[in-house]
């Protein structure tokens, strides 16, 4: 439903390497500081290229149906959260902000995983990177933990994101602009 509201579609997804420096085997060891500058927390294996977890979620368009694609976290040294930069320090652009500017985007609608890390960081990067409105579709997001998800919603809203419940609410919002 969200894709039908867009003139252009962007796909971003993790594409991790089996030798990533931030990997841990046990979920109990997840989300602990790594001491690394471009991979701040430990994570269990996810979105490893060539695995089921690397694929797009059921119901999403195929990769070739998107207008712009970002694969992030390919380098085993880097574990970025946002879709706009390949690194946590936000020095290595993925080109997404530049592409959106070239397309004269005025509104960006965001949904994805995980609300409290990748979605939040992407939304904050988009808000800093352009003059467009950033709308977040809550129904199209899932997070890691309820406490950090709630904090992420508040942080995105405080930064200027328009957080709406679902695609129906987004359509209503857009039609009233």
Each predicted region: which residue ranges?
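Gly/Ser/Thr-rich loops at beta-strand to alpha-helix junctions
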Residues: 16-17, 114-118
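Hydrophobic residues at beta-strand termini and immediately following loops
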Residues: 70-72, 137, 164
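A short helix->loop->beta-strand "cap" motif at the edges of active sites that frequently abuts
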Residues: 5-7, 130-133
């Amino acid at each position: 439903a969200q894709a039908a509201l867009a003139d252009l579609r962007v796909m971003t997804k993790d594409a991790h390497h089996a030798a990533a420096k931030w990997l841990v085997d046990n979920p109990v060891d997840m989300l602990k500081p790594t001491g690394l500058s471009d991979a701040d927390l430990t994570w269990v294996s996810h979105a490893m290229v060539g695995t089921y977890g690397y694929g797009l979620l059921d119901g999403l368009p195929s990769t070739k149906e998107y207008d712009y694609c970002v694969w992030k976290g390919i380098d085993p040294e880097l574990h970025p959260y946002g879709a706009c930069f390949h690194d946590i320090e936000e020095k290595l652009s993925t080109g997404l902000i530049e592409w959106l500017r070239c397309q004269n985007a005025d509104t960006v609608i965001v949904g994805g995983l995980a609300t409290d890390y990748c979605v939040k960081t992407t939304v904050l990067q988009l808000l800093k990177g352009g003059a467009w409105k950033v709308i977040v579709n809550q129904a199209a997001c899932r997070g890691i933990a309820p406490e950090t998800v709630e904090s992420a919603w508040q942080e995105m809203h405080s930064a200027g994101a328009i957080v709406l419940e679902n695609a129906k609410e987004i359509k209503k919002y857009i039609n009233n602009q």
